[in-house]
Amino acid sequence: MNLEIMQNSLVNFAFGGLLIAMLVYWISLAFPGIGGLNRLATLITLLVNIALTLTLSSRWFANGYFPLSNLYESLLFLAWGLTFVHLFIENKTKSRLIGATAIPVAMFVTAFASLALPLEMQKASPLVPALKSNWLMMHVSIMMLSYAILILGSLLSILFLIITKGKDINLKGSSIGTGSYKVKNTDAKSTLIFSSQVGIVQEQSNMLINSTRMNLLESIDNLSYRTIGLGFPLLTIGIIAGAVWANEAWGSYWSWDPKETWALITWLIFAAYLHSRITKSWQGKKPAILASLGFLVVWICYLGVNFLGKGLHSYGWLA
């Protein structure tokens, strides 16, 4: 079989598998009583990750360099990173939420790579001299992996904001959660305060609070924090590696290239998020808003700047 045909078949399989996995994850959340759905979705995601691994490995073998030299390859690597990180976190937390949020993004990325990009952008081309460096694999792979992790963490924060829309819910305690929360219905003046640590419930009205939902919100907030905490050090290492590579290739650590500027903005936003969690002990909506802003900025840094056709990192599609 022709190598290019095999790669296209694997990418098509990945897209179809992600579509099915997304539906299965959503059904498992809607009908938690149905057994085996989560395992099925996890198995499908694992097969998709293997398919993407084979695709990237075959391009590496065929072209002789790590497959991160163009937009098509970086999108496939991002989809691989999203599925890999999702499988890792799901294995650690046993939570279906990460799959229900990660898989749709991975599916969109795969579809965009295979359906939206022109064929000439999907083909590998010889590397320019500056890219013939081991820094290509280190810098770009770490940056893309950090993007994948930060996107997942930010998505969980967006999910938190969606669920809490219309309610003033403030989680109380340390930044990693203590089982305490305060809820205020924005449509009424009544307030209920609950603390699992002291076992006190004070009710000022007949408003009923679903404790299961509150525990879910705390889990989402917690998981978002831990995920972003994992991605931020990788982003930092990736930026430093890029600066060292830039000095080696062009004689300057930092040139305020649009990509570099937006990478710095991304770093500052997530640094502010972690600062608010660690030093201010923020939980709930305030840090979730910061993380949601970070979600937008990551995509601007990754795709928006590249499509402008300016700077060393540009793919020039819209130029």
Curated annotation (Swiss-Prot):
InterPro entries linked: Cyt_c_assembly, Cyt_c_biogenesis_CcsA, Cyt_c_biogenesis_CcsA/CcmC
Keywords, ordered alphabetically: Chloroplast, Cytochrome c-type biogenesis, Membrane, Plastid, Thylakoid, Transmembrane, Transmembrane helix
Gene Ontology MF: a single term: heme binding
Entry keyword annotation includes 4Fe-4S: no
Membrane topology: Multi-pass membrane protein
Compartments where located: Plastid, Chloroplast thylakoid membrane
GO cellular component terms, semicolon-separated: chloroplast thylakoid membrane; plasma membrane
GO biological process: cytochrome complex assembly
Superkingdom field: Eukaryota
Membrane-spanning parts: 14-34, 36-56, 69-89, 97-117, 142-162, 227-247, 254-274, 288-308
Main localization category: plastid
Complex formation: May interact with Ccs1.
Family: Belongs to the CcmF/CycK/Ccl1/NrfE/CcsA family.
Record-linked HAMAP family: CytC_CcsA (MF_01391)
Job of this protein: Required during biogenesis of c-type cytochromes (cytochrome c6 and cytochrome f) at the step of heme attachment.
Protein's name according to its UniProt entry: Cytochrome c biogenesis protein CcsA
Organism: Pyropia yezoensis (Susabi-nori)
